[in-house]
Amino acid sequence: MRENVKFHDGEKLNADAVIANFNRYKQVSPKSSPFYTLDIKSSYPGLKDVVKIDDMSFKLVFENPQPTLLYSMVNFSSPIYSPKNFNEKGDFNGLPQGTGPFKLVEHQKDQYALLEAFDGYYGEKAAAKRIRVRVIPDPDTRLAALKSGEIMGVMDLGAIPPTLAKELLKDSQFEISATKSTISHYLHPNGKKAPFDNPNMRQAVSMMIDRQQLVKELYLGYPTATVNFLNNTSPFYKDMKPDYRPEEAKKLAVEVLGSQRKSIDLIVPTYGLDRYPYKAQAELFQSVLKDLQLDVNIRILDGAAFKEAQSKGDYDLALATQGLPNGDPYTLFTNYLSSTGSSNKSYSLGYKNDRVDQLLNQVKTTLSMDERKNIYNELQTIAASDLPTIPLFNDASLIAYNKKITGYKATIYGTTLPELKWAS
């Protein structure tokens, strides 16, 4: 490990601190949150032990070789906190104490977080002394706060809807920054009941959606339309163009439904409405799916009710997003495509493919990166054919800011916050 790194509370980063964090991962896993679930079994599959070599070196021992371990070590399940930061249950005993350029000095849930530049940071120091990150759920309120000068910029997922970004750019004092995002958007089908237990019906829906139009009309062309389950920021991503064939889709629907019409429920999470044009997107799907003999009823549910409906199978289609945990898609493929995958079960996808299970078992012991890529290519191809979930597009990380600040750009997940400073 890097020498002379300190936590925000003054403790030294060393092998003991890392081992304390891994012990905490084991103790609390699986630990759910509104963000990502902390689960060491999915983040570090097959991990047997964490061994101290010396003060600044440690060893991870696995059941099988892990050629993509470095990808896993930069995922959301791998933060390293001060070993004094946990109580006996593994929960935080105060504000998180990391090693980054900013220290969290104050936090009011659902209101704001106050960041302060950490003087003991080992790298280039943050340009701003203090940054207050406010929570403003409503996009119109965020835009109004930005235009009034109440805030200098917006950040995070769906920070500014593309339509509002277009409006904002009419004012020369504001700027937009956009880049690829690790977030993908899907239409989850309930594969445990008719009609979406039939892959032909899932294919019909997929071919009926004009993804290019969706991206252009509702997202102003910032995202990238795709039929690939895997996000395009992964080094294993395979480019797969959307297949828009409405007439073929109608034929498949007739094969499944005959002459009957089917009433279905499309559920939409309220948190998506705060970030994306999900209402308009749901209404678009409601319109186009009529031609597949599907009468869509839109149900808007809060986060808890949305998750419950999916787990109980009380839905037919669901608007959903998924982030890419890390560059190696093993965990993502396992969660969604494995017959015992956690997302497969909790979203009632009802997907099972013996070849997929075989490939996922095979990749666990595959050392060659070329062979690993071949396996992932096949998994992407199978997913595009079977559609356990229906991919729509890879999102774009889109942020907006007042030109009174500089050094503020979008990254694939977040912003260049340490570089932010006043322009004058």
Feature map (PLM): residue ranges:
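Aromatic- and charge-enriched surface segment that lines or borders ligand/interaction sites
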Residues: M1-K31, P195
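Periplasmic binding protein-like
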Residues: G10, K290-T340, I375
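Surface-exposed binding/hinge segments that line
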Residues: K12, L38-K84
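Short, well-ordered beta-strand elements
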Residues: V18-N21, F58-K59, G100-K103, A113-L114, ...
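Short, solvent-exposed loop/beta-turn-alpha elements that line the ligand-binding surface or hinge
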Residues: Q27-Y36, N75-H107, G120-A127, A165-S181, ...
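Bilobed periplasmic-binding protein-like "clamshell/Venus-flytrap" ligand-binding domains
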Residues: P67-M73, E255-L273, A318-Q322, T366-Y401
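Extracellular/periplasmic solute-recognition and catalytic clefts
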Residues: V105-E116, R132-P195, K216
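Append "and occasionally in soluble cytosolic enzymes with long acidic Gly/Pro-rich linkers
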Residues: D197-S287, N297, E378
